[in-house]
């Protein structure tokens, strides 16, 4: 990896965030964490991550809503990591803009392989700039 990828983990469970932080950092990734949907969206706008890992069960808003709002201004890959295991829930997330879906509990080796695969599809440092456009007015986030 010629440049360190930045991964934003949005999950309300501190133990999961810690486990992912340690696992991802051991592979050379820079990890940013958020415990709520609103905090995650703000971090995404500020840090411009190369990959977003998103839990769907957040305390302040549903992860599907986070995904919809994130997709309004970013094409960065999103890996959903959730206990929601039904086919319908997976399809909804994937059709809603997620690039991949992993169900909790999960194996870390498979998770890391999926992270690598998503980062290969969207080279590090080529994350879309965060901006909102309203008619002729563009707001750089």
Description of each model-found segment:
Residues 18-26:
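Charged docking surfaces used in two-component/phosphorelay signaling
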Residues 17, 59, 86, 104:
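The feature encodes the CheY-like receiver
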Residues 3-8, 117-141:
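Short, Lys/Arg-enriched segments at the junction into DNA-binding effector domains
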Residues 28-36, 43:
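Short hydrophobic/Thr-rich beta-strand motif most characteristic of the beta2 strand and flanking loop
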Residues 36-39, 62-65, 70, 89:
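Acidic catalytic/metal-coordinating carboxylates
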Residues 47-53, 58:
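Active-site beta3 strand of CheY-like receiver
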Residues 45-47, 69-76, 96:
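Conserved phosphotransfer cores of two-component systems
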């Amino acid at each position: 990896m010629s440049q360190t990828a930045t991964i934003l983990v949005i999950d309300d469970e501190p133990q999961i965030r810690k486990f992912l932080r340690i696992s991802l950092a051991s592979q050379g990734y820079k990890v940013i964490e958020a415990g709520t949907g609103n905090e995650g969206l703000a971090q995404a706008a500020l840090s411009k991550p190369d990959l977003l890992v998103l839990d769907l069960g957040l305390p302040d808003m549903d992860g599907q809503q986070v995904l919809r709002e994130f997709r309004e201004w970013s094409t960065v890959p999103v890996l959903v990591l959730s206990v929601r295991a039904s086919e319908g829930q997976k399809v909804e997330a994937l059709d809603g803009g997620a690039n991949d879906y992993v169900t909790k509990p999960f194996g870390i080796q498979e998770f890391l392989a999926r992270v690598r695969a998503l980062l290969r599809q969207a080279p590090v440092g080529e994350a879309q700039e965060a901006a909102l456009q309203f008619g002729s007015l563009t707001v750089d986030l």
